[in-house]
Regions:
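Terminal ABC-like ATPase head and other globular end-domains that cap long coiled-coil arms
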Residues: 1-157
Length: 157
Protein backbone atom coordinates (compact mmCIF):
# COMPACT_ATOMS: atom_id res chain seq x y z
CA UNK A 1 0.00 0.00 0.00
CA UNK A 2 2.80 2.43 0.84
CA UNK A 3 4.31 2.09 -2.62
CA UNK A 4 0.93 2.86 -4.23
CA UNK A 5 0.84 6.13 -2.28
CA UNK A 6 4.57 6.88 -2.68
CA UNK A 7 5.68 5.27 -5.98
CA UNK A 8 9.32 6.34 -5.57
CA UNK A 9 9.50 5.10 -1.98
CA UNK A 10 9.40 1.95 0.06
CA UNK A 11 7.77 1.10 3.38
CA UNK A 12 8.24 -1.84 5.72
CA UNK A 13 6.83 -3.12 8.98
CA UNK A 14 9.66 -4.41 11.17
CA UNK A 15 8.90 -6.87 13.96
CA UNK A 16 10.73 -5.88 17.12
CA UNK A 17 12.08 -8.55 19.44
CA UNK A 18 13.60 -8.30 22.88
CA UNK A 19 16.99 -9.44 21.60
CA UNK A 20 16.96 -6.54 19.08
CA UNK A 21 16.95 -4.12 21.99
CA UNK A 22 20.21 -3.04 23.66
CA UNK A 23 21.26 -5.09 26.72
CA UNK A 24 19.01 -8.01 25.82
CA UNK A 25 20.44 -11.52 25.85
CA UNK A 26 17.20 -13.42 25.16
CA UNK A 27 17.34 -15.38 21.88
CA UNK A 28 14.08 -17.20 22.56
CA UNK A 29 11.68 -17.34 19.57
CA UNK A 30 8.51 -17.62 21.67
CA UNK A 31 5.70 -15.07 21.43
CA UNK A 32 6.91 -13.38 24.62
CA UNK A 33 10.11 -12.41 22.79
CA UNK A 34 8.18 -10.14 20.37
CA UNK A 35 7.63 -6.66 21.78
CA UNK A 36 6.16 -4.60 18.93
CA UNK A 37 6.23 -3.44 15.35
CA UNK A 38 8.17 -0.50 13.92
CA UNK A 39 7.62 1.34 10.65
CA UNK A 40 10.61 1.97 8.39
CA UNK A 41 10.22 4.04 5.21
CA UNK A 42 12.02 5.83 2.43
CA UNK A 43 10.19 8.53 0.48
CA UNK A 44 12.89 9.20 -2.12
CA UNK A 45 14.18 5.89 -3.42
CA UNK A 46 13.71 2.18 -3.06
CA UNK A 47 17.45 1.97 -2.29
CA UNK A 48 17.61 5.05 -0.04
CA UNK A 49 18.34 4.80 3.66
CA UNK A 50 15.22 3.85 5.62
CA UNK A 51 13.91 6.24 8.26
CA UNK A 52 12.05 5.36 11.44
CA UNK A 53 8.64 6.91 12.08
CA UNK A 54 10.13 9.21 14.75
CA UNK A 55 12.27 10.92 12.08
CA UNK A 56 9.37 11.84 9.78
CA UNK A 57 7.38 15.05 9.38
CA UNK A 58 3.73 15.20 10.43
CA UNK A 59 2.52 14.73 6.86
CA UNK A 60 4.85 11.77 6.30
CA UNK A 61 3.63 10.16 9.54
CA UNK A 62 0.02 10.67 8.40
CA UNK A 63 0.78 9.01 5.06
CA UNK A 64 2.41 6.03 6.81
CA UNK A 65 -0.61 5.67 9.10
CA UNK A 66 -2.98 5.78 6.12
CA UNK A 67 -0.95 3.13 4.26
CA UNK A 68 -1.12 0.89 7.33
CA UNK A 69 -4.88 1.46 7.71
CA UNK A 70 -5.49 0.71 4.03
CA UNK A 71 -3.37 -2.47 4.28
CA UNK A 72 -5.30 -3.66 7.34
CA UNK A 73 -8.57 -2.94 5.51
CA UNK A 74 -7.48 -5.29 2.74
CA UNK A 75 -7.03 -8.10 5.28
CA UNK A 76 -10.09 -7.37 7.44
CA UNK A 77 -12.50 -5.15 5.49
CA UNK A 78 -15.48 -3.28 6.90
CA UNK A 79 -18.44 -2.09 4.83
CA UNK A 80 -18.18 1.54 5.96
CA UNK A 81 -15.41 4.03 6.82
CA UNK A 82 -15.71 7.58 8.15
CA UNK A 83 -12.50 9.63 7.82
CA UNK A 84 -12.30 13.16 9.22
CA UNK A 85 -9.87 15.48 7.41
CA UNK A 86 -7.43 12.64 6.78
CA UNK A 87 -5.68 14.79 4.15
CA UNK A 88 -5.13 17.87 6.34
CA UNK A 89 -1.36 17.38 6.83
CA UNK A 90 -0.56 15.95 3.40
CA UNK A 91 1.20 17.62 0.47
CA UNK A 92 -0.90 17.98 -2.71
CA UNK A 93 0.74 15.00 -4.48
CA UNK A 94 -0.05 12.72 -1.54
CA UNK A 95 -3.60 14.09 -1.18
CA UNK A 96 -4.15 13.11 -4.82
CA UNK A 97 -2.69 9.63 -4.21
CA UNK A 98 -4.85 9.09 -1.11
CA UNK A 99 -7.97 10.29 -2.96
CA UNK A 100 -7.22 7.84 -5.80
CA UNK A 101 -6.67 5.03 -3.30
CA UNK A 102 -10.01 5.72 -1.60
CA UNK A 103 -11.73 5.92 -4.97
CA UNK A 104 -10.32 2.47 -5.82
CA UNK A 105 -11.18 0.99 -2.41
CA UNK A 106 -14.70 2.44 -2.53
CA UNK A 107 -15.69 -0.26 -5.00
CA UNK A 108 -15.97 -2.63 -2.01
CA UNK A 109 -16.87 -0.27 0.84
CA UNK A 110 -18.50 3.09 1.50
CA UNK A 111 -16.29 6.03 2.48
CA UNK A 112 -17.40 9.28 4.04
CA UNK A 113 -14.58 11.82 4.18
CA UNK A 114 -14.51 15.38 5.43
CA UNK A 115 -12.02 17.69 3.76
CA UNK A 116 -11.08 21.28 3.09
CA UNK A 117 -8.88 20.26 0.13
CA UNK A 118 -9.84 20.00 -3.57
CA UNK A 119 -7.98 16.75 -4.31
CA UNK A 120 -10.40 14.62 -2.28
CA UNK A 121 -13.39 16.33 -3.88
CA UNK A 122 -12.09 15.54 -7.39
CA UNK A 123 -12.27 11.80 -6.64
CA UNK A 124 -15.64 11.83 -4.83
CA UNK A 125 -19.07 11.14 -6.28
CA UNK A 126 -21.40 12.75 -3.71
CA UNK A 127 -21.02 16.04 -1.83
CA UNK A 128 -22.60 17.56 1.25
CA UNK A 129 -22.22 21.01 2.75
CA UNK A 130 -22.55 21.75 6.45
CA UNK A 131 -23.99 25.15 7.29
CA UNK A 132 -23.87 26.64 10.79
CA UNK A 133 -26.54 29.29 11.25
CA UNK A 134 -28.28 30.59 14.39
CA UNK A 135 -26.32 28.11 16.54
CA UNK A 136 -27.66 25.18 14.49
CA UNK A 137 -25.79 22.99 11.99
CA UNK A 138 -27.61 21.67 8.95
CA UNK A 139 -26.48 19.44 6.10
CA UNK A 140 -27.52 19.58 2.48
CA UNK A 141 -26.41 17.85 -0.69
CA UNK A 142 -24.41 20.16 -2.97
CA UNK A 143 -22.80 19.94 -6.40
CA UNK A 144 -19.15 19.17 -7.03
CA UNK A 145 -18.71 22.73 -8.28
CA UNK A 146 -20.17 24.14 -5.02
CA UNK A 147 -17.89 21.89 -2.97
CA UNK A 148 -14.80 22.99 -4.92
CA UNK A 149 -15.83 26.62 -4.64
CA UNK A 150 -16.20 26.27 -0.88
CA UNK A 151 -12.78 24.66 -0.29
CA UNK A 152 -11.07 27.16 -2.59
CA UNK A 153 -12.52 30.01 -0.49
CA UNK A 154 -11.13 28.32 2.64
CA UNK A 155 -7.56 28.05 1.29
CA UNK A 156 -5.06 30.60 2.66
CA UNK A 157 -4.08 33.19 0.08
Amino acid sequence: MFEKLVPAGQGRLVIQRKHDLPNSEDNNTSVENYVGVAISVSFNSKNDEQQRIQQLSGGQKSLCALALIFAIQQCDPAPFYCLDELDANLDAQYRTAVASMIEELSENAQYICTTFRPEMIQAADKFFGVIFQNKVSSIQEITKENALEFVEQEQPQ
